[in-house]
Structures are given as C-alpha cells and as structure tokens.
C-alpha cells in the first residue's frame, strides 16, 4: 500500500463517517429525492422530459416505445436502474397519479386498483402537450446547463417552466433525514394566485388562499375541513382529511332498502384493496348491515355499490366505513423543496414567490438571448441593405477580385453610401442593430457605412434572386421588423413593469389553454366522525341496578302486556340485586347522572353498553369516577349540543341576582302561606333550569346552563346535609308547578317560582316537611290534563286526575296521594301519564312488565288502587317509568294467551276488594 499511496493521512473514523454520510445524504437530497422549487421536478423527471424532447417525442408526433425513452435516459443522463426510470414515466402518464399528466401514454399504464403497467417493450409514450410548457424556451439560454454523469452531455439544471409545477402536480419523496409530500392543485387557481402576488407582493398567505383555496386531487374526493389546509399553507406542514364521495340512495327494486354508491376515492387509495377491506370487516362482523358489495366501475367512471339489509340506516353504515376504512384518509402535507440548492420548508407564499422569481429570470434571460439574435440578424440585414443600395459597385468589386477572401477584404475596406438604411437607423438608434462585441470601426460613421466581416461574408453568400426589386423591398421590410422587435425587447429589459406584463400574458395564455374546473370539493368546517355518527339513532331503555350495574337495551325489545302480566325479565339479578333506575332515552342523547353525594356526571346513552335482558350490565365504576359508597340516584336526558349552542357554558352563575350562596337550607317560614294557595309568587325570568329534590325534602333550582360543560370527574350539583341524598331532578322553565311525593303516601303541590334561583353550591330550600322515618320518593312537574299514576311496593297502583291534588305552599306536610297500609306497603313511585301511554314496572328481582295506562283504574286520592304487577311473596316493586312511543297502537301485538288471562283475572280480583275503591277523607 505504501508503494501505491503518495501519502497516508490518519483520519478519525467518527469524523470520516460523519463527512461521508453527510456527502451521501446531500447527494440523495439534492440529486434524487427532493424537487426543485422552481420547476417542481426531481432530477429523474427532468431527465425523462429532456430525453423525450431530444428524441423529438413531441405531443403532435407519433408515439415511441417506452423502452426507447428509458434507454436514452439511463444511457445519457440517469445512471440508475431502468425500472426506476420506467416507473417514473408510468406515473407521469397515469391520470389518477398526476393532476396534469406530463406524458401521454398508449397501452396499459396500470389502474387505480393497483394493477401494474405493462412492460416497457409493450407501451408507447410521447410528451403531453402541457409538458412542452415546462421546456418552453429551453434553447434560448434561459437556464444553466450542467454536465451529465460522464461529462459527455449537457443537461438543464432546471426547466424554464411556464407552469408552477411544484404546486400544480405536487411531489413526494423520502430523502435522508427529511421527506416531502406536496399535494397537487388546480392550475387555474395557482396561476390566479401568482397573478395576484405579482400585482401585490405584500399579500399574506391568508389573502392568497382566496385564490388558492386548497389542494385539488386527480381522483377528486372531498377535503374535510380547512384547518389542515390553513396550517399547511402558513407553515409548510399540516394534515388534511380526504373523504370518498358517497351517496346513500334507495334501491329501485329493494323494497325500501338502501344502498351506498361511491364515485370518488381519496388520493392514492387502492380501490381493490378498499373493497377487500370492506369485505373483511363484514366477515368479521366489525361492520354490520351490508348484504352485497360489488364494483361497477367502467370506462365511464368509478362506481362501487354497497347494498344494505332492510332496516339499516345508510348514513350510519357509511360513517362506520369512514371510521374503519380508508374511505376517509389523512394526507400529511410537508412542503420541502430545494431553493438555491438547499432544502427548505416553504409556505404557500414562498412557493409562489420562488416561481415568479424564476419566471422573471427566465423571461429576462430569454429576452437577452432574443435581443442578441435580433441584433445579429439586423446587423446582417443592414449590411445586405447597404449592398443592395450600392449593387453596381458591389458587383463590380466582386467581379474584379481574384479570390473570395480578397473580395471580402475589399468590401470591408470600402466606405459605402448608406442612404437606404440611414433613416431607419436614425429612427431606431445608431446602436439598435449593433452587436455588443462589434469593433467601433464598423457601421455608420461620418455619413458612410463600413461593413463588418460578418456582413461582407453575408453579401458574398447572397443569392442572385435577392437582387430583384421585390426582394429588396422584402429585405428592408424585414429589417424594419427587426428594429421594432429590438425596441420591444429593450423595453422589456429596461422596464420592470413591462417585464411583469409579459409574464402575466404568458401565464394567462397557459391558463386559457390548460385550465380546468376544480375536482376536489372542500368542506369549510371539518365534519369529525364521532362515536355518535356510528350509532343508529333509536330509543333505548337504560337501567341502573341497586348494585351499581348499568346497561341499555332497545325499547323495541319489549312488547306491551296486559295489566297484571308476569312480564319479561329485564336483567339477570345476582346477590339480591335489583333495578333501581330506568329511563327511556334516545341513543344519541346526553344523560345527566346525579349521585347520592350531590354530584352530577355526564354520559352519552350509547356509552352505556348494550346487553341482553338477562345480562347484569357493566359496573358504573367502570363508566364513571364514583367514590366508594357513592351511587347514582337520578338520571336526566338533555340535548347537550343544543344547550351549548343556545346558552353557552358558564361555569358558575352563583353571583346571579337573588341566588342563594350559603350552604344552609332556607326554611319554609320565609314564604307566607295561606290555605291552598301561596300568598306571593316571586317573578323570575324564563329559561331552562334543573329542579332537584332530596330525600330529606329539600328542593333547589339551578340554571341548566351550569351543567352544559361536561367534566370527566363530575361536578357538584348541590350541597347535601349529612345522610341526605338526591332523589329526583327535572328540567323546567321557571314557571312550572312541582309535586313532591313521600313514602308515607303524601303529596305537596306548589309553584316552582317560590323557589329562588340558586347556584350549584347552595343546599336549597325546604320543599316538604317529612315525618320520622319518611322520605321523598318522587318529584313531578305536572302537565295540563295529566293524570298521576302512583304505585306501592306491593305492586298496587292507581290513576288520579291532576285536579284532585290541591295547591299548597312550599314546606308543608301535603295531602294524601295514596293509602299506605299493610296491603299496599309504602309508596315507591309516582309518574304523570296521559291516555294511551304505557308504563314499565320493575321488581327488586328483575321482573319487568310493560302495560297500558288505560288498564289502570282511575280513582281518587284516598284509595288503595288495583294490582299492577303480580309479585312473589318475597318480591317488592322498586321502579315505575312512563314509556312514550312515537305513534301507532299496539293492540294487535298484545299477548292473548296465559298472561292476558292471568292479568284480567288479577284485575277482577283486585277490583272486587271493597277497600280498593273506598273513598276516604281527601285530606
């Protein structure tokens, strides 16, 4: 080794690795992976287009074999594998890959299904017409040239493009330590942005977005939301969500069934793989409701048909497809391109400025080139015009010269008469056609014209037919045109405004010829898929057991039964657990769950897991952050979204006028009461409130808006005395009436307005005075014409007209609502009902009965009622809930067998008891 090396230098291996890797990285970055910000092309694209141009493979000429182009590219300009070059050509010829194709292909160039292109020996290509705009004026010294890999050829360092190709067709690539991913855009919109920036260089990115609203993909689709676009245009980085275009329509012969039609896909999505993925999800039952899936795409366009089963909601299935497949996909924008040979992250304005600056340089260099050529041509014409005006002496001089060289020297040495061109030269300027490097001794001087060597040579080469008078006139006319052209070129070079005008005219011409309509729709506000979008909207029965287990079931799972029926088991009870709360709620509704400790929690109905009738459900502690010993005591259904839109989400309104801030219970003595009426009602503004009642008889009214901002850890709804619990809550408007029922069968009815508005931290005021061992069991907000249905723990109940319940002042003991004795047991619930409605009854052993209100006898307050549900000796009734159905009677659905007979028999037995219908003292 010592004989071969002149000198050996010790090098630290870490330093050498750093330098060598840096050299390699920069080679990949500059020479392979990143596009130039000026023409938007990577080296391989630039070399392919240049090779096709050199081959004369123009848009208006016959196709050439792809292999021919690939061979020229790898042989002259791109020393890499033929596969990489051919893949580049294929991509530039695919209408689903490039927004504006640069190569016109003939043959199989692949498909959106991921099919590969045919081998290069089978396909043919030529440049697309648009590609010529990238190479326009290349021969006019508009760009720098660099040697190819072996120094035998010269190739352009950048294309003199008239098209802002970086934005128009985008680019993607992975370099060392960096990557780029630029989406395509609409040509007309990008040119409009360029023109606007040329008119006002101070435009901001946001102002430029008025002209360039967002990417425009070749496969169309829908961009979901503008936030990602704005971020990417401002910073060069962002994420946009692209959705397929799909519609839900009713099948022509489907008997009411729906089908989903997909006509556009997100950019770069493989259609065949998408269909396979959907089929896989259906097979795994991750997406339900799809009965058939087929691809009906043809030469006229894309069409994927998804047929649904009867009863399935198309929008819900489509939302599930968006969530679980690439029908909605993310395009990560990362605008990294080479500027002055260095990688830079560019925002929207940066990209447009780089292109406009490039066009200014190209047009300037082209104008300088054209001016030089025009002056050279004008100089020759000037000499020929002088010769023609002195034709006889010139011919005589040439005839008398022994050799062409001597004739040339004598032509140069002679001073010629120049009257034919002198006037034109004076008008255009003495130096108008004078080449910059021409010796001062030549040209017009002292009234005579001295020919240059170039002019003398042109005269010697002049053909005889040019000596005719007509040709003489043509020559002078051409000379005048050259002078005019030179004047225009000089104006372009000396007047920046005229230079920008030329650039504008060329951009407008490109837009007029190649501009087209936008394909991709942009949805202004992002439509985020939430869990609610994936859930079919339906009424559900939500139950919470005494042991703290929650579940939901479709309301349709229960059929109406006759009064006294044994019913269906609503849940599987273990360890003597029983259903304590039941609510019929929409699957998309928000539930306010009030706990025994005075806190409120938020849950969407669909967040409560669905379970069968015999299943126990899921522990509430897995759904809510409940403390030890804390249990849910009330549920309330609200439209949270509407509440937030209409009322905002003020955290605390405790300082509102009239609010009770102290944590003490306000005694009833504060309100003067008279027999049956309240002496004075406090005037309050109308609005939405939550009216709450506790087991100790305390009530409180708080603005609903204070519960419109969900907290994951819950929120204090009211402060409680030790041992007290919340038993009911309802939404009111501030002008309703309130009815409180106690376990002793008593009820008190008073105006809501006597209860002042209070903040969340207040304890409330006395609503009903209770005896020892008694507690509130129900609170109702009565409606006009309603009837009150009460039920006792032994399964007896009755209906009583609302008019039978007198109004009393807040804080009293109330009047009898239902007789409580050994037969009936304590009062467990009261609900208000209307004719034609249904109720649900639940026992502590999980038995559930759904029956019509009409089958419960209508009677006065001081009565015992009739049998509502047949209970075992060790079974008690614990729940009563009103069920409201949208429409239609269910008479035909009522069971007519054993349960019906049994319920009718029970009814007769109950009504035969004298005590059941005996009227007593209404007080």
UniProtKB/Swiss-Prot annotation:
It is an enzyme of class 5 (isomerase). Coiled coil: none annotated. Its main location: cytoplasm. Residues 34-534 form the Topo IIA-type catalytic domain. One of its GO terms (biological process) is DNA topological change. A motif (GyrA-box) lies at residues 561-567. Signal peptide: none annotated. Residues 881-923 are annotated as: Disordered. This is DNA gyrase subunit A.
């Amino acid at each position: 080794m010592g004989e071969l090396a002149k000198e050996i230098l010790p090098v630290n291996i870490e330093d050498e690795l750093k330098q060598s890797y840096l050299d390699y990285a920069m080679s990949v970055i500059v020479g392979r992976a990143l596009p130039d910000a000026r023409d938007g092309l990577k080296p391989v694209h630039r070399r392919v287009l240049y090779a096709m141009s050199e081959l004369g493979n123009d848009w208006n000429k016959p196709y050439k074999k792809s292999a021919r182009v690939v061979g020229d590219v790898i042989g002259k300009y791109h020393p890499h594998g033929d596969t990489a070059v051919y893949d580049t050509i294929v991509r530039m010829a695919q209408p689903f890959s490039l927004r504006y194709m640069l190569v016109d292909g003939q043959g199989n160039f692949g498909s959106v299904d991921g099919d590969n292109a045919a081998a290069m020996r089978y396909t043919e290509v030529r440049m697309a017409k648009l590609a010529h705009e990238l190479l326009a004026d290349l021969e006019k010294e508009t760009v720098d040239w660099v040697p190819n890999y072996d120094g035998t050829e010269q190739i352009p360092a950048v294309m003199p493009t008239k098209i802002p190709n970086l934005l128009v067709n985008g680019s993607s690539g992975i370099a060392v330590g960096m990557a780029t991913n630029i989406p395509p855009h609409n040509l007309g919109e990008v040119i409009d942005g360029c023109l606007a920036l040329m008119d006002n260089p101070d435009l901001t990115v946001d102002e430029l977005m008025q002209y360039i609203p967002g990417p425009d993909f070749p496969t169309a689709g829908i961009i979901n939301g503008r936030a990602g676009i704005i971020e990417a245009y401002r910073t060069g980085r962002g994420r946009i969500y692209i959705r397929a275009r799909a519609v839900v329509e009713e099948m022509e012969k489907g008997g009411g069934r729906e089908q989903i039609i997909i006509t556009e896909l997100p950019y770069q999505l493989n259609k065949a793989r998408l269909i396979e993925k959907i089929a896989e999800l259906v097979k795994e039952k991750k997406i339900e409701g799809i009965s058939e899936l087929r691809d009906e795409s043809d030469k006229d366009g894309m069409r994927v048909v998804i047929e649904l089963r009867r009863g399935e909601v198309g929008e819900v299935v489509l939302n599930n497809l968006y969530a679980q497949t690439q029908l909605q996909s993310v395009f990560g924008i990362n605008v990294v391109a080479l500027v002055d040979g260095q990688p830079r992250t560019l925002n929207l304005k940066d990209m447009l400025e780089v292109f406009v600056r490039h066009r200014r340089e190209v047009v300037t260099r082209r104008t300088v080139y054209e001016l030089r050529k025009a002056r050279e041509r004008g100089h020759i014409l000037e000499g020929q015009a002088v010769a023609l005006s002195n034709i006889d002496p010139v011919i005589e001089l040439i005839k008398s010269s022994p050799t062409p060289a001597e004739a040339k020297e004598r032509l140069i040495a002679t001073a010629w008469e120049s009257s034919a061109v002198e006037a034109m030269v004076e008008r255009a300027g003495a130096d108008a056609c004078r080449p910059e490097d021409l010796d001062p001794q030549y040209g017009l001087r002292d009234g005579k014209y001295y020919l240059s060597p170039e002019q003398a040579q042109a005269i010697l080469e002049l053909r005889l037919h040019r000596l005719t008078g007509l040709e003489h006139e043509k020559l002078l006319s051409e000379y005048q045109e050259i002078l005019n052209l030179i004047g225009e070129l000089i104006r372009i070079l000396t007047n920046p405004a005229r230079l920008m005008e030329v650039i504008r005219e060329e951009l407008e011409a490109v837009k007029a010829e190649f501009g087209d309509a936008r394909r991709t729709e942009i949805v202004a506000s992002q439509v985020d898929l939430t869990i609610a979008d994936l859930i079919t909207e339906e009424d559900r029965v939500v139950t919470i057991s005494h042991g703290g287990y929650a579940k939901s079931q479709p309301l349709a799972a229960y059929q109406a039964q006759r009064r006294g029926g044994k019913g269906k088991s609503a849940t599987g009870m273990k360890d003597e657990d029983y259903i304590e709360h039941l609510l019929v709620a929409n699957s998309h509704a928000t539930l306010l769950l009030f706990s025994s400790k005075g806190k409120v929690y938020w849950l969407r109905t669909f967040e409560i897991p669905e379970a069968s009738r015999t299943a126990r459900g899921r522990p509430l502690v897995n759904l809510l952050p409940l403390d030890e010993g804390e249990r849910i005591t009330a549920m309330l259904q609200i439209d949270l979204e509407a509440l937030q839109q209409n009322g905002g989400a003020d955290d605390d309104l405790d300082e509102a006028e009239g609010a009770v801030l102290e944590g003490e219970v306000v005694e009833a003595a504060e309100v003067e009461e008279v027999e049956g009426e309240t002496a004075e009602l406090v005037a309050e503004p109308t609005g939405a409130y939550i009216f709450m009642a506790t087991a100790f008889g305390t009530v409180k009214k708080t603005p609903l808006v204070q519960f419109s901002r969900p907290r994951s850890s819950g929120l204090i709804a009211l402060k409680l005395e030790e041992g007290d619990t919340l038993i009911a809550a309802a939404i009111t408007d501030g002008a309703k009436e309130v009815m409180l029922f106690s376990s002793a069968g008593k009820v008190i009815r008073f105006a809501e307005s006597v209860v002042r508005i209070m903040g969340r931290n207040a304890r409330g005021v006395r609503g009903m005075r209770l005896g020892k061992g008694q507690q509130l069991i129900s609170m109702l907000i009565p409606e006009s014409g309603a009837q009150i249905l009460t039920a006792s723990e032994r399964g007896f109940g009755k209906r009583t007209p609302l008019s039978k319940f007198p109004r009393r002042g807040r804080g009293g003991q109330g009047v009898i609502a239902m007789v409580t004795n050994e037969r009936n047991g304590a009062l467990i619930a009261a609900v208000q009902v209307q004719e034609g409605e249904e109720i649900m009854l639940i026992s502590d052993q999980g038995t559930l009965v759904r029956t019509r209100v009409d089958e419960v006898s209508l009677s006065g307050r001081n009565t015992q009622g009739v049998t509502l549900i047949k209970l075992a000796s060790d079974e008690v009734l614990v729940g009563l809930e009103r069920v409201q159905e949208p429409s239609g009677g269910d008479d035909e659905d009522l069971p007519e067998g054993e349960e019906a007979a049994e319920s009718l028999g029970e009814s007769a037995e109950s009504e035969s008891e004298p005590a059941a219908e005996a009227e007593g003292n209404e007080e």
